[in-house]
Structures are given as structure tokens and as C-alpha cells.
């Protein structure tokens, strides 16, 4: 057989195989389609059965829910009907109670009307009786009603006026006694708790020398050294027969301190000539400035005062080198601060403000030789300049009466200032001036007409005058006290204040037999 024939046979076989394959595939596809149709019908039937079951179940649930809702609505309706019935019963009860009250009110109103009528009848009867009595009284006394009223009112007015005057006097006396007692207690406690160790200072200072030959070196050739030192410091150097000592005299303690430091440095150095003196004086001034600041800071530390301006601290330090009647002003200010704080504590007041004012009250004395005006006013202006509070400014200006005090602390500082100044040994006068002042006080008092005797007491701070009662009455005593005060103020010079006490005593003696 040729090749072509084989090829044809192969092709025929392939075609037959393809046809058989297609037939087999088609048959299997028809079988699968038939099975799928059967499965679909089965699933559809199951779904229909499930849907029918769920439908029935939903219908049952809906019926149950409907039954529950109907039962709930019926229950609520029953409760509402019960509530309405209860409210109706309450309303009926209230209506019945209101009816009873209304009936009772009507009965009371009727009873009140009857009583009102009786009262009106009684008032009418009383008016008739009153008119009869008034007419009868006018006939018997011979006075009209207005005259009788005026007479009675005048009698009552006199009695009330007298009783009021007696009561006022008793109250004033009791209040004064209580106030004096409390004031004495406060001042006594404050003085007991304040221990001051500083008394009067002098206006001279003694510088010790290693030998008397040093006096000649201090004087210098033709006195040039002593003149230079006196010119630069403004202090008098007194060189006398006192062995190994030179006296520095001056009323400005700062200058005196500068001179002391400079002179002591010159003595230690040994080189004493005008150029060296000038150098030492400059160093001494710087040392004093440093000392002034340290003293001011120490004063604030001792009193517990904080927040002061640095310039106020410096002015406080300068007060160490100021004296008033021999009393060191810085020590006096510290003492016043403590006293004011203690008195404030005794009175139940915060002592901080009182202590602050007490420390600063004499700050004006640090510059009063540079600025014109009373030191209290100067001090208040300085405090205002350095942003102290209005109460502090007022209290400083008022501590000598130059301003009207606006706080209790200002009054306390006035009292503390007087206590510190009046303390024995705080301020010094010469014995001769002291005796002359006492004699002059008694002389002024004895010159007045009607004076029986007078005594200067309390170290010259009080003059007690006994007058003749037959010559002077109470008004005359008041006038005499004022006149004596004016005469003392015009003729005498004295520290602090002087109390003028005029006493008029009348005695009446009778004997019972």
C-alpha cells in the first residue's frame, strides 16, 4: 500500500475517534444536566418547605406578641382606671373638707362680727366715760387738756434728762476706768517684754594715744595737721592736759565717727601729714558708708521687717549716728518697733504693720538737716517716695500730730514713741537745766490766782496744781489749765510733753448728834 493510503486511513480513524469522543462528552453532559435539574428541584422543594415552616413560626410569634401587647394594654388600662378612681375619691374628700372649713369660717366670721359689735359698743361707752372724766378733771384742776399735757411732759422731760445724765456719767466713768486699766496692762506687758540696753549718748569721743608725743605729731608744724583734720571732718579736736588722749567734739555723729576712724588709722600708720590725713579721711568715709548699710540691715533683721527699699535701709543705718536729747535714734527706732509690735499683739492686732511703722517713724531725722520741715512730714514723704503703703506713710507723718492718724497702728506708734522717750535714762539733760525747768514749772503755776500749791512731778513731765475751791469753780479750773499750757509752751523748752493737772477739791463735813 502506498503512503497516501495510510494517511487516509489515519485521518479516517482520527475522525471516527473525534466523533466517538464528542458523543461520549455530549452524553455525559446530558447526564449531568439531568442530575442538576433533579438537584435544583430538590433544593426548591426544601426551600419551599423551610419557607412554609418559617412562615408558620412567624405567624405564631406575631400572634404571641399581639397577645402580650393586648394583655399589657389591658393591665395599664386597669391601673389607670384604679388611679382615676383613687384621685376621684381624694377630690371628693377634699371637697368635703373644704365644705366643712367653709362652714367653720362662716361660723367664726359670724362670731367675730358679734365680738366687733360688742367692742364698738364698749369703745363708745369708754369714750363717753373719758369725756365725762376729762370734763370733771378740767373743772376740778382748773387746767385745760393741753395745759395738763404740757405740764406732764415737762415733768417727764426733766426726770428723763436727769436720769440720762446720771446714766451717761456712769457709763463714761466705767468706760474710762476700763480703758485706762486695759491701756496700763498693754503698756506694762509691752515694757516688761522689751529689754532695752541703750541709754544716752554724748557729743564727744575720746581717742586713746600710745604716748603724749603723738599729740605733737597730730598738731603738726604750725598746727597744719590738726587744721587739715578739722577742716576735712568738721569735728573739733581738743588736745589738753589729759594724758594719752585726744577728745573729738562735734554734734554730727557721722562726722565724729569719720574723724575717729581716720585718727586711729593715722596713729597706727604713724605717717601724719596733710596728704595722708586726706587719704585716711576718704577711707574712713567709705568705711562709715559700709557700716551705715550694715547697721540698717541689722536693724531690719532685729525687728523682723522685710521688703524695705535699699535706700530706706541706708537711711536707717544713718540713724545710728543721730541722737535726740542724747538718745541714739536707731536704737530708739528699734525699741519703738518692738514696743509697738508687743502692744499690737496684746490688742489682738497683726504686729507686722505696727513694727514696720515703729522702725521707720524717725526716718526723716536722717535727712532733716538737708530738707526743710518737721521730721515726721519729711519721713512720710520719704516712705511714699520708696513705695511704702498709705497706712505706713500716714502713721509716720502722724506720730507727732502733724497729720491726722488714720489707723490704730499710728496711735500705737505714738504711744510707743512716748514710752521709749520717757524711759528713765533714755534722754539726758543737764542737772542744772532740769532743776531750773522744774522750778519754772512751779513758778508759772503759782503765779495764777487761786492756786494753793503746785508740784512738778514725773521728772518734770507733769505739773499738779491744787486750787482753792472758794476762788475757782470747775469752769475756772479748765480755763486755768489752758492758760498754763499756753504759757509753758511759750516760755519753756522741754522734750516730749508736759501734763497740766488742775485739782479742785471741795469737802462738806456735818456731824450727826
UniProtKB/Swiss-Prot annotation:
Residues 329-422 form the HD domain. PROSITE patterns: HD, KH_TYPE_1. The keyword Transmembrane applies. Its EC number is 3.1.-.-. Residues 203-288 form the KH domain. Residues 35-59 are annotated as: Disordered. SUPFAM superfamilies: Eukaryotic type KH-domain (KH-domain type I), HD-domain/PDEase-like. It comes from the Bacteria. Endoribonuclease that initiates mRNA decay. This is Ribonuclease Y. The lineage of its organism: Bacteria, Bacillati, Bacillota, Clostridia, Eubacteriales.
Amino acid at each position: 500500500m502506498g503512503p497516501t493510503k495510510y494517511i487516509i486511513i489515519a485521518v479516517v480513524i482520527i475522525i471516527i475517534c473525534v466523533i466517538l469522543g464528542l458523543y461520549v462528552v455530549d452524553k455525559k453532559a446530558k447526564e449531568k444536566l439531568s442530575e442538576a435539574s433533579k438537584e435544583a428541584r430538590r433544593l426548591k422543594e426544601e426551600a419551599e418547605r423551610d419557607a412554609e415552616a418559617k412562615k408558620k413560626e412567624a405567624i405564631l410569634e406575631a400572634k404571641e406578641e399581639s397577645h402580650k401587647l393586648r394583655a399589657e394594654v389591658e393591665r395599664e388600662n386597669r391601673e389607670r382606671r384604679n388611679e382615676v378612681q383613687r384621685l376621684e375619691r381624694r377630690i371628693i374628700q377634699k371637697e368635703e373638707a373644704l365644705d366643712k372649713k367653709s362652714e367653720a369660717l362662716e361660723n367664726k366670721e359670724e362670731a367675730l362680727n358679734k365680738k366687733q359689735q360688742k367692742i364698738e359698743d364698749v369703745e363708745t361707752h369708754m369714750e363717753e366715760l373719758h369725756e365725762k372724766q376729762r370734763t370733771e378733771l378740767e373743772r376740778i384742776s382748773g387746767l385745760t387738756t393741753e395745759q395738763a399735757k404740757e405740764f406732764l411732759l415737762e415733768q417727764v422731760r426733766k426726770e428723763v434728762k436727769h436720769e440720762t445724765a446720771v446714766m451717761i456719767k456712769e457709763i463714761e466713768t466705767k468706760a474710762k476706768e476700763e480703758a485706762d486699766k486695759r491701756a496700763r496692762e498693754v503698756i506694762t506687758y509691752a515694757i516688761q517684754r522689751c529689754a532695752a540696753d541703750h541709754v544716752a549718748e554724748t557729743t564727744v569721743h575720746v581717742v586713746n594715744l600710745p604716748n603724749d608725743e603723738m599729740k605733737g605729731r597730730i598738731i603738726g608744724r604750725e598746727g597744719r595737721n590738726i587744721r587739715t583734720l578739722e577742716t576735712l571732718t568738721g569735728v573739733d579736736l581738743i588736745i589738753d592736759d589729759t594724758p594719752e588722749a585726744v577728745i573729738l567734739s562735734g554734734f554730727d555723729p557721722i562726722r565724729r565717727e569719720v574723724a575717729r576712724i581716720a585718727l586711729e588709722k593715722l596713729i597706727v600708720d604713724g605717717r601724719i601729714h596733710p596728704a595722708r590725713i586726706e587719704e585716711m579721711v576718704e577711707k574712713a568715709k567709705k568705711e562709715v558708708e559700709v557700716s551705715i548699710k550694715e547697721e540698717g540691715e541689722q536693724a531690719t533683721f532685729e525687728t523682723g521687717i522685710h521688703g524695705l527699699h535699699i535706700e530706706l535701709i541706708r537711711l536707717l543705718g544713718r540713724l545710728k549716728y543721730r541722737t535726740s536729747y542724747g538718745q541714739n535714734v536707731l536704737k530708739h527706732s528699734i525699741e519703738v518697733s518692738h514696743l509697738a509690735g508687743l502692744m499690737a499683739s496684746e490688742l489682738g492686732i497683726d504686729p507686722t504693720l505696727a513694727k514696720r511703722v515703729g522702725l521707720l517713724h524717725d526716718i526723716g531725722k536722717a535727712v532733716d538737716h538737708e530738707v526743710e520741715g518737721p521730721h515726721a512730714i519729711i519721713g512720710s514723704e520719704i516712705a511714699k517716695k520708696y513705695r511704702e503703703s498709705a497706712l505706713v506713710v500716714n502713721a509716720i507723718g502722724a506720730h507727732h500730730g502733724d497729720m491726722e492718724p488714720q489707723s490704730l497702728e499710728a496711735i500705737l506708734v505714738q504711744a510707743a514713741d512716748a514710752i521709749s522717750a520717757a524711759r528713765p535714762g533714755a534722754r539726758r539733760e543737764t542737772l542744772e537745766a532740769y532743776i531750773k525747768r522744774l522750778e519754772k514749772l512751779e513758778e508759772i503755776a503759782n503765779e495764777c490766782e487761786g492756786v494753793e500749791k503746785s508740784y512738778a512731778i514725773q521728772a518734770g513731765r507733769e505739773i499738779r496744781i491744787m486750787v482753792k475751791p472758794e476762788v475757782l469753780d470747775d469752769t475756772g479750773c479748765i480755763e486755768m489749765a489752758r492758760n498754763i499750757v499756753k504759757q509753758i509752751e511759750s516760755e519753756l523748752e522741754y522734750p516730749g510733753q508736759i501734763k497740766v493737772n488742775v485739782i479742785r477739791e471741795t469737802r462738806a463735813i456735818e456731824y450727826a448728834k
